[in-house]
């Protein structure tokens, strides 16, 4: 039996491996899952949110081997023709996706100190996949790549210049794969000329950021050298005065490592609310009058609206605001509160459309008289990674599959 070719997409995190298998002809999802708890005593593998297995071992190689075994049991292993890897940080070396070879692996290692928690995990996944699927072309897709079009005035920190020159300390930005996908979808859905429009895209999830896109290129973004900067997130503080951290260190005796853990794991929505990092939990509590939840959501929205206003100044023209990501796509409350903050831009929300949005669909949520269009457009990072794998992996062969997908 001849199997239709598929693309395996791998995203290795600090303690998990997310994976998807997509058809190579139209990038439809065939199967997806997650190996979680890597590095703990109780790792498990869940497939399609239903089937769950305990894993006997808990490193990346064994977890990926278990994933490969499950794919083989389902008759999918032999269909895999390409593999795409999400890589967190490409530094200044990688501005676009690349086919993986030994040289590329070494270059990724060079920039990995910029994102040690994620890049080394990504590299474990690359190494394991190259062993498990020898001979299959693999592609690295960088979360920072889309933002390599930022100008120096947008990416430099006002620190002594030598730290940028010698250590690479600058703003890089993240969620680039999501932004690339949404930019393409926005042009077709909204009927814009992608080479002549100004967008602000709000990728709102447990990690959250903004990107100002002018004529299809990133010109500003809220995350910085790490994903900590910018918006309030689930457990990350976002922007915080360094002086406040220095004060805490002096007053409490906490170390740099203690403070780093605090701003990344104990802050954000969780820190303010004292209840949860999950926006769904906070929204329920918000409507029930929970003081901490209301404060967390109002502070989240204020920070978001303030950053949107700032990002607008990086555009030549502000045509549309796009909400995406888990919160952006599913929270009518956050969209409503944010747009109400942005009335100064002439944004006029259509409350009925905002509340009636069907899950997984794109929708304009402003009225015809709104000076700036606001819309919800679902992201699909796995599809974007698969498309890059197809574009690069089949390029040398001139395969018709590429033409069918693109």
From Swiss-Prot:
List, alphabetically, the InterPro entries matched.
Ac/propionate_kinase, Aliphatic_acid_kin_short-chain, Aliphatic_acid_kinase_CS, ATPase_NBD, Propionate_kinase
Please write the reaction equations for the catalytic activity of this protein. propanoate + ATP = propanoyl phosphate + ADP
| Site location (Transition state stabilizer) | 175, 236
Enzymatic class: transferase
Any idea which positions bind Mg(2+)? 11
Q: In which pathway does it act?
A: Amino-acid degradation; L-threonine degradation via propanoate pathway; propanoate from L-threonine: step 4/4
Alphabetical keyword list = ATP-binding, Kinase, Magnesium, Metal-binding, Nucleotide-binding, Transferase
Database matches in CDD domains: ASKHA_NBD_AcK_PK
Q: What does the entry list under GO cellular component?
A: cytosol
Residues given in the record as ATP binding sites: 11, 18, 175, 203-207, 278-280, 326-330
Q: Which domain of life, per UniProt?
A: Bacteria
Cofactor annotation = Mg(2+)
UniProt KW DNA-binding keyword: no
In the UniProt entry, which residues are flagged as the active site?
Answer: 143
The entry's function note states: Catalyzes the conversion of propionyl phosphate and ADP to propionate and ATP.
Q: Which family does it belong to?
A: Belongs to the acetokinase family. TdcD subfamily.
Instruction: State the oligomer form and interacting partners.
Output: Homodimer.
What is this protein called in UniProt?
Propionate kinase
Instruction: State the taxonomy lineage.
Output: Bacteria, Pseudomonadati, Pseudomonadota, Gammaproteobacteria, Enterobacterales
């Amino acid at each position: 039996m001849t199997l239709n070719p598929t693309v395996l997409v791998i995203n290795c995190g600090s303690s998990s491996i997310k994976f998807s298998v997509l058809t190579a002809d139209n990038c439809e999802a065939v199967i997806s899952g997650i190996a979680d708890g890597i590095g703990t005593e109780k790792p498990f593998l869940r497939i399609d949110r239903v089937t769950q297995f305990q894993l006997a071992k808990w490193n990346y190689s064994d977890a990926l081997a278990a994933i490969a075994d499950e794919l083989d049991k389902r008759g999918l292993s032999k269909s895999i023709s390409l593999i795409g890897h999400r890589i967190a940080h490409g530094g200044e070396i990688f501005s676009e996706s690349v086919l993986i070879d030994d040289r590329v692996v070494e270059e990724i290692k060079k920039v990995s100190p910029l994102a040690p928690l994620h890049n080394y995990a990504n590299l474990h996944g690359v190494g394991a996949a190259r062993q498990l699927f020898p001979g299959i072309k693999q592609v690295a897709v960088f979360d920072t790549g889309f933002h390599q079009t930022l100008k120096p005035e947008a990416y430099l920190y006002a620190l002594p210049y030598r730290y940028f020159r010698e250590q690479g300390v600058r703003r890089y930005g993240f969620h680039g794969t999501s932004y690339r996908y949404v930019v393409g979808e926005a042009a077709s859905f909204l009927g814009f000329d992608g080479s002549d429009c100004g967008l602000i895209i709000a990728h709102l999830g447990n990690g959250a950021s903004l990107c100002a896109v002018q004529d299809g290129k990133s010109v500003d973004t809220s995350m910085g050298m790490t994903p900590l900067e910018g918006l309030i997130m689930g457990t990350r503080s976002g922007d915080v005065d360094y002086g406040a951290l220095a004060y805490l260190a002096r007053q409490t005796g906490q170390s740099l490592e203690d403070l780093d853990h605090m701003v990344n794991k104990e802050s954000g929505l969780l820190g303010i609310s004292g209840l949860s990092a999950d926006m769904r939990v906070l929204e329920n509590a918000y409507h029930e009058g929970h003081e901490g939840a209301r404060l967390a959501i109002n502070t989240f929205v204020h920070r978001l609206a303030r950053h949107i206003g700032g990002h607008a100044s990086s555009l030549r023209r502000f045509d549309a605001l796009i909400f995406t990501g888990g919160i952006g796509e599913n929270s009518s409350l956050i969209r409503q509160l944010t747009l109400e903050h942005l009335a100064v831009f002439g944004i006029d929300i259509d409350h009925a459309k905002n509340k009636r949005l069907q899950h997984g669909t794109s929708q304009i949520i402003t009225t015809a008289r709104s000076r700036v269009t606001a819309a919800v457009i679902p992201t699909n990072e796995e599809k974007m990674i698969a498309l890059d794998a197809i574009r690069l992996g089949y390029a040398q062969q001139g395969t018709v599959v590429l033409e069918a997908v693109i």
